[in-house]
């Protein structure tokens, strides 16, 4: 917390899953949290609970694939007053239908790239003035181990490609934004039991939340351009394919 009040963080895709849990954890750590979600009404109960215990939280409508929505979100966050000390690019999509390459639909391919790669890039660009104003900030991109070449198995090509692009963005922006004291890192949360990951996911949601929150708190430091991984439970089997094999 600073003399002017708590540091502010925006979390995209914060209406459920990892984004919501990370937002709640950051509020508990003393951050002023802005939940970015496509429908603000979805987080009404969350806002009420957080405010009931004195946490400084708010929400803005934000669709990371819509430039108009992004611009409106920037204006809404600016109206809250003060700079933005951290941005968590968590919003993402996964399409089970594209498991086999021949089943990939053009619309899904575009959606994967727009949401998982272009969205974080354009959101970061739009919020750059507010991040610069903090005098030391953090951008955290939620990625996936599916982008690692040693996991390639011929499945989910569009998703892997989009997350690999996100990793390239992370490394390049870490260099570009270093003069502004903005660290840019990626976090691999593992395969976690959320709406996206499914109930059979073997990795720890709590560990993923801790990894994201820890990356946010690197704001103003010098640890940048890194791929940070959540701690995995011993013997975690990785993601199970339809044929019974596993992948991580």
Describe the residue ranges of each PLM region.
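Hydrophobic positions on the long internal alpha-helix
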Residues: 88, 123-127, 131, 169-170
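Conserved glycine-rich cofactor-binding loop
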Residues: 15-17
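C-terminal helical subdomain
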Residues: 179-180, 186-192, 198-248
């Amino acid at each position: 917390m600073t003399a002017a009040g708590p540091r502010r963080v925006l979390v995209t895709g914060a209406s459920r899953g990892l984004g919501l849990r990370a937002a709640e954890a950051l509020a508990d750590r003393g951050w002023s949290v802005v939940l970015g979600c496509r429908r603000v009404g979805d987080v009404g109960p969350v806002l009420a609970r957080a405010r009931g215990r004195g946490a400084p939280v708010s929400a803005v409508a934000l669709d990371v694939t819509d430039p108009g929505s992004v611009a409106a979100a920037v204006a809404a966050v600016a109206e809250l007053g003060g700079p933005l000390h951290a941005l968590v690019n968590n919003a993402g999509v996964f399409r089970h239908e594209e498991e086999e390459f021949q089943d990939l639909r053009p619309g899904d391919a575009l959606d994967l790239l727009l949401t998982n790669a272009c969205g974080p890039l354009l959101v970061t660009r739009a919020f750059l003035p507010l991040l610069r104003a903090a005098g030391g900030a953090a951008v955290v991109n939620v990625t996936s181990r599916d982008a690692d070449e040693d996991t390639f198995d011929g499945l989910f090509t569009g998703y892997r490609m989009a997350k690999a692009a996100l990793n390239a963005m992370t490394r390049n922006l870490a260099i570009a934004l270093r003069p502004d004291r903005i660290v840019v890192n990626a976090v691999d949360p593992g395969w976690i039991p959320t709406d996206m990951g499914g109930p059979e996911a073997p990795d720890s949601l709590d560990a993923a939340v801790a990894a994201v929150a820890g990356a946010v708190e690197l704001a103003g430091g010098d640890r940048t351009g890194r791929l940070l991984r959540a701690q995995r439970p011993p013997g975690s089997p990785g993601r199970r394919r339809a044929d019974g094999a596993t992948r991580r």
